[in-house]
Amino acid sequence: MGLPWYRVHTVVLNDPGRLIAVHLMHTALVSGWAGSMALYEISVFDPSDPVLNPMWRQGMFVIPFMTRLGVTKSWGGWSITGESVSNPGIWSYEGVATAHILLSGALFMAAIWHWVFWDLELFRDPRTGEPALDLPKIFGIHLFLSGLLCFGFGAFHVTGLYGPGIWVSDPYGITGSVQPVEPAWGPEGFDPFNPGGIASHHIAAGILGILAGLFHLSVRPPQRLYKALRMGNVETVLSSSIAAVFWAAFVVSGTMWYGSAATPIELFGPTRYQWDQGFFQQEIEKRVQGSLASGASLSDAWAKIPEKLSFYDYIGNNPAKGGLFRAGAMNSGDGIAAGWLGHPVFTDKAGNELFVRRMPTFFETFPVLLVDKDGVVRADVPFRRAESKYSIEQVGVSVTFYGGELDGVTFNDPSTVKKYARRAQLGSVFEFDRATLQSDGVFRSSPRGWFTFGHLWFALLFFFGHIWHGARTIFRDVFGGIDPDLDDQVEFGAFQKLGDVTTRRQAV
C-alpha cells in the first residue's frame, strides 16, 4: 500500500491490536527520552552553588520537574539544596531516570508483542465475528483509571500521606523545600499561587473522574447521541483526545509563563512580570527600610539582603530577555554568577542621591539615565558627548557600594562610575565568570521560556489537528461520497431522496 508520509496512520484505523502497539511504542519513546535526558542532565549538572548557579541558570529541563514532585537527592552524594547526603534511597534522580528507562524497555517489548499478535479475540464482536471496539466502554475505563490516578496523586503524594509532598516556597523563592501540603477547600484553593489548591483540585477532579468513569461503564449512550457524535468511529476518539491535549498545553503554557504554585521560581527561574513590576526590587527596598528603622547602618541593612533575592532582581534572569532562537543555557550568555558586588548608591557633587533608570524587558539597548527622587534626570551617559549637558564628568557623579563584596568602597573616576551605572541598569550588580563556558554576553532564556514557547506551538498545532480530525469524522459521509456498492443506479432526479430506492419518482 503506497501511502504518502502524512497518511501512514491509516494502517491502524481498523486494526485495534496494532493501534495499541503504536501507542505503547510512543509511550516507550517518551519514557526513554525522559530517563535518558535526566541521566544526561545529571552528568552535566553542577550542584555546588544552588544560590548563584541554580538548575534553571544551567539550562536543566527535566530536573526541575523531578524536583517539584519531591526528588531532591542524588546517588552522587549531593542534594539540590547544596548539602551532602549519605543515603539518597531508591527514588533519587538516578533512580527515577533508571525506572523510566526500564519502563521504556518493557513498553518496547509490549509494543512488539501487540504488533505481532494483533488479531486477538478480545477485539472481535462475539455476535458478528468482525473486528469491533466498544468505544464508549473504553472511554469509561480510561476515565475511571485516570480519575483513580488523579485522586491518588492529590490525596497521597501531594499531602504526604504516602509520598514526599511537593516543592513549596515563599513568594520570593527563598525558603523552598519539599513538604506535605494541606488541601485548601475554601476560595483560597483557587489562588494559582496556593499549593493547597494543587492537592484539593487533584482530589476533587479525581473523584469526578472516578464517578464519570463508573457512569460511562454502566450507562449506554442514547442512539441519537451515539450517531450525532460519531461515537462508533475511532477518529472521533482521536479528535477528542487531541482536544484534551491541546487544552492542557494551553493551560500549562499560561501557568508556566505567568507563574503558579506548580512552577516555583527556585526551579524554573523568575517570570518576566516580576521584573516588569519591580517585584523583587520592592521587597528588597522594604527589607532595607525595615532594617534602617530598627537602627541598622546602610551597610548592615544591605548586607542582610539574601544573595538569592538580589540575584532574582537581575534582568539577565528574565526569561523574556533571551531570544527564542538563541540556543543554550543562561550561563552561556552572561556567564556564571560569581558574587554580588553590593548595592550602588550614586550621588552628584551637590550630594543628591541619584537612581539609575532600569532597562525595560523588551529593550536590547537603553539610555543610561540617573534621576533624582522626583524623577528629574540629573545625569546620563550621552550618545554624543559634543551635545552633552548631564554627563557623568560634567555632573561629577560618584558611586558607593553597600553590602556585598565592595561594601564601603567609593569610586569617583568617571569611567568606573559609568561602568557601574550601565550595570545598575540591569538590576542588582553581580560579577560574572564568562571564561569558564566561553559565554558570549548575549542573554538567553530560561527553561520557563522554552517550555512556554514549545507548548504554545504544540497547542496551536494540535488545535488545528482537532479541527481537522473532528471535521473528518463528523462529515465522513460527505467526504466519503456515495457508496459504490449500491446495486441500483443512483442518479440525481431519479429518487425523491438520493439513493433511497423506496422513494422512486413516478413518471408523469
Swiss-Prot record:
Q: Which GO terms describe its molecular function?
A: chlorophyll binding; electron transporter, transferring electrons within the cyclic electron transport pathway of photosynthesis activity
Q: Which SUPFAM superfamilies match?
A: Photosystem II antenna protein-like
Q: Family, per the entry?
A: Belongs to the PsbB/PsbC family. PsbB subfamily.
Tell me if Transmembrane is a UniProt keyword of this record: yes
Does Chloroplast count among this protein's keywords?
yes
This entry carries the following GO cellular component terms, namely:
chloroplast thylakoid membrane; photosystem II
Co-factor: note? Binds multiple chlorophylls. PSII binds additional chlorophylls, carotenoids and specific lipids.
Where would you say this protein principally sits, based on its record? Answer: plastid
Q: Which Pfam families match?
A: PSII
Q: How is this protein named in the record?
A: Photosystem II CP47 reaction center protein
Q: Which cysteines link up through disulfide bonds?
A: none
Report the membrane topology from the UniProt record.
Multi-pass membrane protein
Quaternary structure and interacting proteins, as annotated: PSII is composed of 1 copy each of membrane proteins PsbA, PsbB, PsbC, PsbD, PsbE, PsbF, PsbH, PsbI, PsbJ, PsbK, PsbL, PsbM, PsbT, PsbX, PsbY, PsbZ, Psb30/Ycf12, at least 3 peripheral proteins of the oxygen-evolving complex and a large number of cofactors. It forms dimeric complexes.
Q: Which residues cross the membrane?
A: 21-36, 101-115, 140-156, 203-218, 237-252, 457-472
What does the entry give for GO biological process?
A: photosynthetic electron transport in photosystem II
Q: Where does it localize? A: Plastid, Chloroplast thylakoid membrane
Instruction: Report keywords, A-Z.
Output: Chlorophyll, Chloroplast, Chromophore, Membrane, Photosynthesis, Photosystem II, Plastid, Thylakoid, Transmembrane, Transmembrane helix
- What is the documented function of this protein? One of the components of the core complex of photosystem II (PSII). It binds chlorophyll and helps catalyze the primary light-induced photochemical processes of PSII. PSII is a light-driven water:plastoquinone oxidoreductase, using light energy to abstract electrons from H(2)O, generating O(2) and a proton gradient subsequently used for ATP formation.
